[in-house]
Amino acid sequence: VADARKRNHSSAKAAGARFEREIADWLAVHVDDRIDRRVKTGARDCGDLAGIRAHGQKVIAELKNTAAWNPGTWLREAEKERANDGALAGVVIAKRHGIAAPAQQVVLMTVADFAALLTGVRPAEQEGS
């Protein structure tokens, strides 16, 4: 039996916006009340949430609510947005389908971003380091 709840472009955008709002609201309560959804800016996008900081520096978050996982593409997008914003690190927050609780969603990042979050210093941008 085919799933009757197939997404179209409009319903996918609405689901993405809902996911962004749920994550932003949860982070605002549990981390910093300045965290909120970011206004979309086009080619120089700086992530989906604003107000995330670590060690006094900006961190960008790219949020994904899609059944098909593509972590490589998502991480490249987060890195581009991190550079656009001059942020310390970039992370991807991905929806775990069937799991509603915002705190139970998944965060993906490179080891370089993980090190930056832990130390407050972005590692040298050399291949393999």
Model features per residue range: what roles?
Residues 1-129:
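Catalytic phosphate/metal-binding cores of nucleic-acid and nucleotide-processing enzymes, i.e., regions
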